[in-house]
Design a protein with these regions (language model features):
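Short active-site neighborhood of thiol/selenol oxidoreductases, capturing the structured segment around
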Residues: 14-34, 149
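A short beta-strand-turn-helix
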Residues: 1-21
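Short, internal strand/loop/helix patches
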Residues: 76-113, 118-119
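Short, thiol/selenol-centered motifs that function as redox-active sites or metal-ligating centers
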Residues: 27-38, 64, 109, 167-168
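Thiol-/selenol-based redox modules, centered on thioredoxin-like
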Residues: 113-168
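Structural microenvironment flanking redox-active thiols in thiol-disulfide oxidoreductases
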Residues: 34-82, 93-100
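Structural recognition of the beta-strand scaffold that forms the well-ordered cores
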Residues: 23-24, 55-60, 88-91, 111
Length: 168
């Protein structure tokens, strides 16, 4: 896919072949997304992986006039105010890429390896299945994205390839 970023540049996923890529479907109005940003959880993951040459693409699939929609300048402000560090914020306002990836919620996470193969898709963590869905204590959460990335960095198979996403 190719989408426009916050700087009006067209970003092509295929151009990142040879690098690990994390896709994060996001919606700044979603309380589950807010939880991960308000606790600095998402930003810590972004820093950890972008500092290790991983491409992090935050994708907004909200159409103008719909909940979660932001302009390019609002996306830049959100990135700055939250101290977020995605490689790019991408706009999918017609939802085509979201449908292509079957992105159902925000956050909905995807991990792609250097060959361009999807290695993980689903929830960011296990709070959606532990009964702690609304908890703000993420310290005991099993982070599926971190586990998938650790496996890739070790050259191992990702144990949990699919989990049920939760969110908005």
């Amino acid at each position: 896919f190719t989408l426009m970023n916050q700087d009006s540049e067209m970003i092509d996923l295929a151009s990142f072949k040879g690098k690990k890529v994390i896709l994060e479907w996001t919606n700044h109005d979603c309380p589950f997304v807010k939880r991960h940003y308000d606790t600095d959880n998402m930003q810590e993951l972004q820093r950890e992986y972008t500092d290790n040459d991983v491409v992090w693409l935050s994708i907004i699939s909200s159409a103008e006039g719909k909940q979660g929609y932001v302009t390019k300048s609002e996306a830049k402000e959100l990135t700055t105010s939250r101290n977020a560090q995605p490689s790019h914020v991408l706009f999918d306002s017609n939802g085509d890429v979201g449908r292509l990836y079957d992105a159902k919620t925000t956050p909905h996470m995807y991990v792609i390896d250097e060959k361009g193969l999807l290695r993980y898709q689903g929830a960011i963590d296990n709070l959606g299945v532990t009964g702690a869905l609304f908890s703000t204590d993420l310290s005991k959460a099993k982070n599926y994205v971190r586990n998938a990335m650790n496996s890739l960095f070790l050259g191992e198979e990702v144990a949990e390839k699919n989990t049920r996403p939760y969110g908005c």
